[in-house]
Amino acid sequence: MDSVSGYAAGAGQPRVGGKIVRPRRTAVVRTPCERPVQRSRDPPQQNPSWISRLVYKPASVIASGAGKFISSVVFSDSSSSSEEDEDSSSDIDGDEDVEKNNPDFTEEDLLSAQQPSIQRLSSKRVIEQLLLQETFAREEGDRLIDIIKARVVDHPSVPSAIETSHDDYGLTSDVNVGEMSNTAVMEARKWLEEKKSGSSSKYKATEDGAGSPVDVAKSYMRARLPWGSPAANNLDFRSPSSARVQGTPLPYSAGNFSSSKLKRKSGSNQSWNIQDEIRKVRAKATEEMLKSPSSVASLEPKYSPYVLATDMLKGNASSLNADGAVRNEQSRALPNSAIPTSEHNQTTEANQAVKETGVLHTRSRGVGLEETFISTQGVKPSEDTNTAPQSGTAVDDFNDQDGDFIQPTSTIGNTTNAVLALGATLDPTGNSCIPKDVFETSKEADEIGASRHTSNGFPSSSPSGYGRSTKTHTTRRNQGFSAYS
């Protein structure tokens, strides 16, 4: 009883009495959320595992799909293109079905299953189709790329990059190259050797402070590649001409050359000694400027072919040659500030004599031409020029007074000079002569003008007097002649 009661107490809750009670089996209460259990017609397999699910079922599916794929590829030559498209589409659909049914299936399993039958086909095409059907992560893509690169083989005539031996400079020794490439290789090797041997010592000297900037530039240019500056090998320095430096045919002064312009125009391929070249260019430019006739002509003053009486009276001695051209004897005279005191005094006396004895009349006509004539009031022509006064001005006649021409002269001190007046021409002997009627008309004009003198010795500025003198006593024989005052 005790055992029975103990059993009952141990099996269930403690009860009173010795009756044995068995536990009842209660059915599991099903809820609407639970799906009904599908019963398969196949007999249940014992001990199912993930290997059977990953290998057996996909293998059967792959076998059926591979049979279709092989048949489509083998008989594609005899079939039309439309049939081939249908077969390929069916194969792709079959492969997609396989991937949907078995998402854990890998590419290696597919290749291992199809390996016996795919050996006769183009494996590259199969691989391409398989790759197009999949999407890869970045790591998987990098791994596939590495595998493909490892399997790359060069053209049969050229050895692969893995089998060829490389030297220290990264150049292959088994590949045959042309003469030009061999020359470039030799130059590169030579340049590297020179750079390794000589560049260290040169740069050490510059770092210590012993080298100048010019030495640094020279070492830098020497260390450059020989093919970096092709013009440096066959460079023949030539001194830049004035036309290239300044852009003009001839420089006007040697000071126009500056070091900055020379450096800018000459370029980087010129000589290193710039200062010597600047000196040479300046000396050459000065030489050319002195030798050039245009520069010499520009230094000499240009004189008018007509000499005025006022210039002659101031002391500028001028004379006429046989051709009628004026030769100035004081072209290289000192400036006005350097004239001696005695010469200045003589010039003052001559100007005073002009005020007393002669008047220079200048009139302008409506057409823009000027007429100049010399007043000779109070002065009579003499037959001998040696009897002329020392401080006066006289107009003499060397020729016959009864002739058609007269030759006027101007006497200043002991010097007698010819005067070129309006209407003057050359006589048969080559001297300057004035027609007699022109000279007489000038004398009459002087007499009328002298009667209208003012207190300061100059003619009156009334327009009526000038107009009457011009109308009455001015000759218009030479309409094209112009005299400059």
Curated annotation (Swiss-Prot):
**Which ranges are annotated Basic and acidic residues under compositional bias?**
32-42
- In which compartments does the protein localize? Nucleus inner membrane
Q: What happens when the gene is disrupted?
A: Aberrant nuclear morphology.
Q: Its Gene Ontology biological processes?
A: nuclear membrane organization
State whether keyword Chloroplast applies.
Answer: no
Q: What does this protein do?
A: Required for nucleus structure organization (e.g. size and shape).
Full protein name = Protein KAKU4
User: Which gene is annotated as encoding this protein in its UniProt record?
Assistant: KAKU4
